[in-house]
Structure formats: C-alpha cells, structure tokens
Amino acid sequence: MKATVDAGAFFKALNRVIPLLKVSAIPALSEASIQFRDGVCTITATDLELWVQTNIPAEGDDFGVVLSGTKSIAKAGKFFRGPLTFSCADAAVSSPQITMACADKSAEFTGYPLKDYPELPRFTCEQAYTANAAQLLICIGRIKYAAQRRSDSRPVMSGVRFYRQQLYCVDGQRLAVCANDAMTVDKTFVVPADAMWILKAFGDQNVSVQVGTRYVCFAAEGLCAYVRRLETCDTLTPEAAIPRSERESYVVDRKEFLQRLTYLKECASPVKTTPVVYFENGCLSLQTPSAWYRAAIELPGRSEVAFAFNLSYMWDALQQFSGHEKVRLHVLSPVSPVTITAEGTDDVALVLPVRYRAAA
C-alpha cells in the first residue's frame, strides 16, 4: 500500500496537531495517526479529552497507521520538499513497517495499527456559531484565572462558560466575565479552560463553533478541534452572582493597588499559603505572626465599608484589567462580593470576601 502527499503541506499539518501529544501510558496516544482515504490524508492527535484533526489532499491507496516518534518525524520534515510517499506492506499487523520517502531522503520506522488508536466519537451539531479564534483566545486568557484546576469532584468549575454574549469562569470564590459581542449563544455550554490553548492553532481566522451533545468543534480551513464538553450548571450565572446594589464604589489606580499588594505579599509569612488583606478606607493591612504590615492607596473620598480578601484572588482580578489605568471597586457590605469594573469595557471581576480580625 502506498500514498503520496505534498511534503510541505504534510509537515505543516503535522505540526498543527503535535502540541497535543504528551507522554501516555498508552503508547499510541503519544503519537499522531495518519489515514489515507478517498484522496484525503487525515492527521489526528488526541488525549481523549481533546481531538485535533487536519486534512490535506493525497493520492494513492486507502490505509491508515499510527506513527512512531511523531515529534522526531516532524523535525526531519524541514529537509523534505516535493512529493512525500508513505508505503506499508500490511497496515493491519501489530507492528506495521512504514517507509517515508521524498526524493533522495527516506525514513523507516515501526508504527502501530490504526485499530490501536481511539476513534473520534460521533459528532452531531446542535448549535452553530462563528467567532474569531484570536479574539476568543484573548478573552479566555483574561478570565481563565478564575477557573479551577481539573477536578473529578467539581469538573464544571474548571471550565469556560459560553453564555449569551459573555464568556466567564467561576470557581466558587471568584468570578471573571468577558464580553463576547460577536457571538450570541442560545444555550449555555462549558468547555475545559485548559484545553482552549488549541485556539492558537487557528491564528487570526474566523472559526466555526459547532456545539454537539458531548463535544464542541472549532473548525477552519481543514483543521478541526473537538473539545469535550463539561456539565452545565444553570445556577452559576453572572446575574446570580454579581450584587445588584452597592453601598459605595470608588475608582482606584490599578498599578498602585498592585504595587501595594506586591509589598504585602513579600511581607507575608512563608507558611501562610493564603495571605488575607484587610481593607479599610484605603488602608491595606496584613497580619503575620510577628507584625502588622500596612500600605495605603489613594481614594477619591472616605470609604465606610471595611472588608478582607484573599491577596492572590484580588491580584488576579486586577490583572484582568491590564489594559486599564483605573478600576472601580463596588462594595455592598463586609460579607458581600467585591465587584471590579473599568471604564470602556464590559468585563467584570468578582472576589468573595473572607472573614478577618480587624487591625489593632
């Protein structure tokens, strides 16, 4: 069996799926598969949560194999030009012998049969949208700090929610919302935040966003990424979490706030894993076993509501507004979430307060 593709197109396509490949207890999952069928070469990589496929034109017989040493093969690709031929005497045996040849260069290796590679689950589109991949990636990059790491007990907390004209992450202690005016979602869906790096593969292209029962497919120009959906919790919405009223709000200098938090973070006891900062009328204070450390930020007037917060959580929330000089803090009470906004953006950050002992 023999099939031929253009070397440049093949290795460009292979390099688009390689970032997904990781060391796996199942050897075949550490590699990419190639399948020639009906004049098309399909290259696939998966970690069983995320699937990436890309297609290029091909000529020759129909067969498929799983590569061995995929990353090394990709490195060799920079020396190949013109027609690239893959040949295999019997692709169905347990250790198929594969020859890759291009002009005066060739490589021989032992691969895996395609039956050892998991099949892409059937996909039926239920919702379809169009969005710019680069804009989605920027938006998710601003808010993914509020997603938990993967957890078997609360997987939904590790996701990015596509909700109406918003994307948001929530982990139970904080909420980060990014406006997504270019895409209005009819029915909320959630995908793992740590899988959204795959959008980099699309560059600045507009992508088709197809939502199925179990997967969401992002596709453009021969590249498809299937991301496993997480369960949806309809009660965890921005409307339900963000306070509808406030007792006071004030504008602060974002960089100044971050500088004061940096100082307090350096002063925190090394054994205190979650330093808590007490905020009262512009004064930030942090208690360690040996001392109280204080720093002040400028407020436009007097603040009446004192509250405390996790230093790291507030730090992350302020970083969400990295393009803004000023941010506005909205406060209702010492036990209500602190909401952060900025002029010129519909982004919202929310940080839950923590219990505190007032400074002496």
Question: Each predicted region: which residue ranges?
Answer:
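Structural preference for solvent-exposed beta-strand-turn elements
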Residues: 1-360
